[in-house]
């Protein structure tokens, strides 16, 4: 019988296999194995719009989101007969006011609109699919559709608050083109009112209940204190609901008065979850875009800022 091909003469096959296995074992014990390859980081951040996909899907598909929203509004409905019914106010703009004067005022509940009453995750999904960020033109087109659905639990709470005798004000940073607010010429305002009426919220078709940014000259900014002050001059504000800290108080004021104001959450203030956008996100990307930057470059700068602020390690 001839010698097997490739085997050195005079060396049994079993002995050679044992030598190879032994060499491998020695190498492993000595730590001479090749180091694990670390995959390089991507050369560029994800496509514009992609970073909102998980948040949008969570709000559209997750049972946890629906449960969270219904839980907030369920608590608010329970509070209608306890803390909301008690003397006092939910508005920082009315704190320090004469108690007897407040007691004589009719009562009101102020709610934010987008992601508090109206679910705009469909708009966010469209922007993600298009690989684009928010812009005024696409947002205006979405508002004109009047197709937003209700945030889970919102309609039932508002109906209960209305039955309890509270007027509902819808305070929103939606706005009309300059020179048209708040008249019938503002198509987006009319579409918003139709949207609210179709959902069956109390007073949703009444234009006087919709307080948009820019409806009055002094309501020009995105801050909401001036509009709450307008309501506070006419009503005792017994509850606030929103998805952003600015729906309740200025962020800087809350930081100064946190110990004093925090107990209002869950008693007169009711905060809805929104991971898609908000003043928290604007604070993160503030300053990443510079004057003259085009939209694509600005979007890329915003994404780069977000990645730079990710914290991979807990503080020791």
Language-model-derived ranges and their functions:
Residues 84-101, 166-173, 204-209, 241:
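Surface-exposed patches in mature extracellular/periplasmic domains of secreted proteins
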Residues 19-31:
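Bacterial N-terminal signal peptides
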Residues 32-111, 289-316:
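Non-catalytic pre-domain segments flanking phosphatase-related domains
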Residues 106, 117-159, 163:
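Active-site neighborhood of HAD-like aspartate-dependent phosphohydrolases
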Residues 115, 154-196, 243-245:
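Substrate-recognition element of Asp-dependent hydrolases with the DxDx(T/V) motif
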Residues 6-21:
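Bacterial N-terminal signal peptides that target proteins for export
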Residues 58-67, 140-148, 170-183, 214-218:
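Second-shell loop/turn segments in exported
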């Amino acid at each position: 019988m001839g010698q097997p091909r490739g085997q050195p003469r005079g060396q049994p096959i079993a002995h050679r296999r044992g030598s190879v296995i032994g060499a491998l074992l020695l190498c492993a014990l000595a730590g001479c194995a090749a180091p694990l390859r670390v995959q390089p980081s991507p050369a560029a951040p994800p496509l514009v719009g992609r970073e909102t996909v998980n948040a949008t899907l969570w709000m559209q598909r997750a049972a946890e989101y629906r449960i969270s929203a219904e839980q907030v509004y369920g608590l608010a409905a329970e509070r209608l007969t306890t803390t909301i019914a008690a003397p006092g106010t939910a508005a920082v703009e009315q704190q320090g006011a004469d108690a007897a004067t407040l007691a004589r005022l009719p009562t009101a509940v102020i709610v934010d609109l987008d992601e508090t009453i109206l679910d705009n995750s469909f708009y966010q999904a469209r922007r993600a699919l298009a690989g684009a960020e928010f812009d005024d033109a696409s947002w205006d087109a979405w508002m004109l559709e009047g197709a937003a659905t209700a945030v889970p639990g919102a309609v039932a709470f508002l109906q209960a608050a209305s039955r309890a005798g509270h007027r509902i004000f819808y305070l929103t940073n939606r706005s009309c083109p300059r020179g048209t607010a708040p008249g019938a010429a503002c198509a987006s305002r009319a579409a918003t009112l139709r949207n609210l009426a179709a959902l069956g919220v109390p007073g949703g078709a009444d234009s006087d209940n919709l307080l948009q940014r820019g409806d009055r000259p002094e309501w020009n900014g995105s801050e909401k204190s001036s509009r709450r002050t307008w309501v506070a001059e006419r009503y005792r504000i017994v509850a606030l609901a929103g998805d952003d800290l600015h729906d309740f108080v200025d962020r800087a004021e809350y930081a100064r008065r946190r110990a004093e104001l925090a107990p209002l959450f869950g008693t007169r203030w009711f905060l809805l979850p929104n991971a898609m956008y908000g003043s928290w996100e604007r604070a993160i990307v503030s300053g990443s875009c510079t004057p003259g930057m085009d939209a694509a470059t600005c979007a890329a700068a915003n994404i780069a800022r977000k990645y730079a602020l990710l914290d991979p390690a807990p503080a020791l």
